[in-house]
Amino acid sequence: MKIDNLTKDIIQWMINYHHESKRESWIIGVSGGIDSAVATSLAVRTNIPTLGIVMPMSTSNHADVIFINRAFHLLNTIRQNYRITCQTIPIQPIIESYQKCGVGLSFIYNENNTFSSYRPIREGNLRSRIRANILYDIACEYCGLVVGTGNKDEDEIGYFTKGGDGLVDICPLSDLHKSTVYKLAEYLDVPQEIIQASPSAGLWDNQTDQQELGMSYDEIEWALDYDDTVTMQKYLGPYQQNVLLKVREMRRKNKHKLCYPPIFKLTREKGGLR
């Protein structure tokens, strides 16, 4: 499908869903990343009131400042042709209040108070969930729908935080590979500094998606589209086999993120419950 037609289809689909929902606005977290930039660019083109929420850890941390600058560059670019309201909410004070209660700690200590391990993913997940809480609080105030920013490669393997960035009302990019998101970004005039930046969730300092996943998005796309009936796995090279196994294992392990929780069902037998 041509990118211009795809763009029109997504925008019309978003408009239709919004009208059916009887809501009044879009609420979206603007991170400075490419998926967020594309989702925001699509939302404003629906001509439905859009609120872009920038939620850095702080306004003094160097890594956060880079993301903030990208986010505001995007918002300033969008404002040249479209309407969007912006709000900045640093989340560091909220995180610190959690950590004072022993929640969301990255540094783990033994009973004798000696250092045990460093688990940045724990604090990273907390950051993501705090941001989701903020977005839904604002959505409540403005009668809005929270726009998801996940793409197919991330969502299919469960590379998102349950109750965090995975908690949304509409997913305009979730059936699009990352490679297609990049094409949309070019078509939608997303700033080049965002397009050229290494993909990162920004959940801890110097984090990149490829480093955390151990594979690139192109490799994930290949694995998701791989058809055993066309090329048997035994004919793949060791590296390809490893990527394929890794992607399939992530899908298996994160299956609980991709569906509703299982529900115990009462059965009826001879007019009664069993």
What is the role of each PLM region?
Residues M1-E156:
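ATP-dependent adenylation/nucleotidyltransferase module used to activate substrates
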Residues I48-T50, A71-N76, I108-E111, L167-P172, ...:
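Short, structured secondary-structure boundary patches
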Residues T40, N69, Y136, S179-Y182, ...:
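Predominant activation on well-ordered alpha-helical scaffold segments within soluble catalytic domains
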Residues Y118-R131, G144-S216:
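Catalytic subdomain that performs nucleotidyl-dependent activation
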Residues A63-I66, T88-E96, I130, T180-D189, ...:
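Low-complexity, flexible helical/coil segments
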Residues N76-C86, F115, P120, L173-Y182, ...:
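Short, basic, helix/turn surface patches
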Residues M1-V30, I34, V38-L42, T46, ...:
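Peripheral terminal appendages
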Residues L75, C101, G163, L188, ...:
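Alpha-helix boundary/capping residues
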